[in-house]
Amino acid sequence: MISASDFRKGVTFEMNGEPYVVLDFQHVKPGKGAAFVRTKYKNLKNGGTREEAFNPSDKFPKAHIETKEMQYLYSDGELYYFMDNETFEQTPLTYEEVEDAIKFLKENDNATIKFYHGKPFQVDPPNFVELQITETEPGVKGDTASNVTKTATVETGAVIHVPLFVNEGDTVRIDTRTGEYMSRV
């Protein structure tokens, strides 16, 4: 069990049978009245966030989240298949479960998959990936205002913003947490 007074950023806990992670917290001790812990937390299953004040003595079960490094194998159109790098066991996931991550994953790329009670609920691609530009407008010479970007489609189908000098066929480094262009490779 974990008490609300032990909340720190990144701590996982269960409430009403759902797993949550603490995003932000603040211990508040007003001049008058009882102390409380103002907490912003995220539901690990559906991604929803909430803010709530808890009594510091409130107790919650600790959510045990298992993390596995898995390799993205292929998609059959409906399901996305990942293989455990240790046991070689395959796990099929639906589009809803991989929605944000799949736009940055190529076949045979590794991803971190989080499990709650043996059921996968979150897929995290590597923080940085290198993908090839498959479609973009050519940069116009003389269009040199600072920080001008254009849209580009990468080989996985994701659409990102890149500087004007990036052309079709170039390989770029992307931060998957923000979806931003980092550099040309």
From Swiss-Prot:
Where is the protein found, in the record's own terms? Cytoplasm
SMART domains, per database record: EFP, Elong-fact-P_C
Coiled-coil segments, which residues?
none
User: Which GO biological process categories is it annotated with?
Assistant: peptide biosynthetic process
Where primarily located?
Answer: cytoplasm
Q: Which PROSITE patterns match?
A: EFP
* GO MF term list: translation elongation factor activity
Q: In which pathway does it act?
A: Protein biosynthesis; polypeptide chain elongation
What GO cellular-component annotations does this UniProt entry give?
A: cytoplasm
User: In this record, what's one Pfam family?
Assistant: Elong-fact-P_C
- Which domain of life, per UniProt? Bacteria
Per UniProt, which keywords does this protein have?
Cytoplasm, Elongation factor, Protein biosynthesis
Which protein family is named in the record?
Belongs to the elongation factor P family.
The protein's role, per its UniProt record: Involved in peptide bond synthesis. Stimulates efficient translation and peptide-bond synthesis on native or reconstituted 70S ribosomes in vitro. Probably functions indirectly by altering the affinity of the ribosome for aminoacyl-tRNA, thus increasing their reactivity as acceptors for peptidyl transferase.
Protein name according to UniProt: Elongation factor P
- What is the native source organism of this protein? Alkaliphilus oremlandii (strain OhILAs)
Q: Which gene encodes it?
A: efp
